[in-house]
Amino acid sequence: MPTEQLENGFSFHGLGTQISFPRGTVATVDGDGRDVVLVWLFDYRGGYALLVIDAETGETEEFPVPFPPGDDCPYASILSSMNRFYTLFNGYFVEFDVLRREYSFFHETAPRMAMGMTEDDDGLIWSSTYPQSGVVCYNPKNGDFTDYGHVYEQNWRQYPTTLAADDTGWLYFGIGTTLSQIIAFDKECGTGIPLLAEEERVKGSPSVFRDMNGKVYAIPPDDTAWAAENPGDEGWFELYKGERKTVAKHELKEKLFIAGKAFHFHPDFPNGKKLERCDLADRELEVSDPRSGDTHKVSFDYSSEGAHIMGVARAPGDTICGGTFFPRRFFSYNPKDDSWIRRESYAQWNTVVTQGDLFFVGGYGSGFLLEWDPTRDWVPTDKDNPESNPFWHRICTPILHRPHDLLAHPDGKTILMAGTPGYGSTGGGLLIWDRESSTGELLEHTDLLPDHSTMSLVALSGGKLLGGTTTEAGTGGEKKAEVAELYQMDLSTKVIDWREALLQGGQSYTDLCVGESGLVYGFVDRARFFVFDPNEKRVIQEMDSEKAYGLTAFQQGPRVFVVAPRGEIYILFERGIGLLDEGSFEIDLVAESPVEISNGGDVLEGRLYFTSTSGLYSWELP
């Protein structure tokens, strides 16, 4: 699709990718006895539809969800014994009747999405929900629906990712990730009972499994934040009638359900055939028949409005490059001939920046650092392949798991990556990477500001570094710091020589930018603009920018400030583009955007490039 010219000097160049992501895939049979594949579809809007694919012909039918997706999506789903497909997200429980090919029930619930789903011995459908251990029950035989609300609250967001019911009707789920807990739920009185004493709780998530003997077994957390999958010999519990009993390692004979978490893939058709592949990128489906040994491949199609773009930057060779998430794809746009290159990327490119003739990527998960040379052939990233391009340097998890800023230092050799820590943790680290030696030093939050994570960075004169923090913990972690701070580090010694919470009540320094005079401009919580004098260590001006211009643009790696080649500082707000007057510190909204701006941002050949949800746009500079 060629670039579309919009009003007021804006242009729409296309989508980063026109592929959706599967959030639960199951093989089953419809009411006519035909093999079908069900896929929950996810693009920038959220979980927008259920796709039903005829496994023989590739014919498809889409069923838009009967409620607003709200930028949320399925994190758990289950195909019941009655051949009905369930999920719960954005505060809505929904049932799809496969035999009749229609949504047969939906109901609003307490926030927000199911992390675990199961079916009990009476055929009741249960879900355990994020963020505060919500419990929902649905009876498909008579349509009775009960939302028990949040039954176990903490001051951090809980992930109740495994769920099981014993043969007496008691429900159990394990939660994490900040501290483990097992909840027994009594449906008769609608209460959740914690089974672990406070002193027994550790970081991570226990797992629960239903056994064929009618009881539920729980295993303790392993060395990850997520539900344990590789149990040891110690710490097992037998759960029955709401009580726990310590037992030796149990040889599980698990009662199986067609249920799973976000990326659940159930390949078995009732007639014995097997779904080998359902590829939304290539739009191909492959089914094998173990009896005949034959494999059948068909093409299919579906609608998609594309995945969220994380952020974009000018790459060497004068292209605009970036990445999308779910699906995780790389793209490169060349304005010279209005052409695109799109490829599968190595995980999620949260932050991107150019230094010299190389393009760097800071990514989620695991806090990885990549280096891409656009002059060489693309070789898919493999950390064990030294010929990879992009080249994999290292990971930083759990100290730094989700990058929020990637700074190309003006010394031409140093790359700094900062962000939040792994799941269930508080306080993120900082990677200082030396390109010349291909070595880096990873500082922990205790080396910086304990219980803070660095959200934004700029280089100051004299070998100093200025950082702005966020009080947000890692996903599912406990927030401990009360207010965000600015800090100054000596880059040679890696020592913090100044820190202060200058802006009262601020929770996150969204982005920072150094002006020609050496003053630093920034935003707090996307809503407050300030000017900071790094010599005097004080804020010399502050304004409520939200009131005047609305919130700034935002993504996991914010690029709110865009500096043009002649030094002009542009600011990306959701509603338009601002120009900063460095003399008066006033902001002039020079262009109202025809679309809501999501993130930046870079300048190339006289145009300022930015993103809006899944699309790449630009505006002609004056």
Predicted features, each with a name:
Residues 36-40, 84-87, 124-127, 171-174, ...:
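Conserved beta-propeller blade signature
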Residues 595-622:
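Blade-level signature of beta-propeller repeat domains, shared across WD40, Kelch, NHL, RCC1
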Residues 55-58, 97-101, 139-143, 186-190, ...:
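Short loop/turn segments that connect beta-strands within beta-propeller blades
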Residues 49-51, 92-94, 134-136, 181-183, ...:
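A short loop-to-beta-strand structural motif that recurs across blades of beta-propeller domains
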Residues 19-29, 70-78, 111-119, 156-164, ...:
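Repeated scaffold domains used in trafficking and secretory/extracellular systems
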Residues 13-21, 64-69, 106-110, 149-155, ...:
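Surface loop/turn motifs at the tips and blade-to-blade linkers of beta-strand repeat domains
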Residues 43, 91, 131, 177, ...:
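Residue-level signature of beta-propeller blades and closely related beta-rich strand-turn architectures
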Residues 223-230, 417-427, 467-483:
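Short, conserved, GDST-rich strand-edge loop motifs in beta-rich repeat architectures
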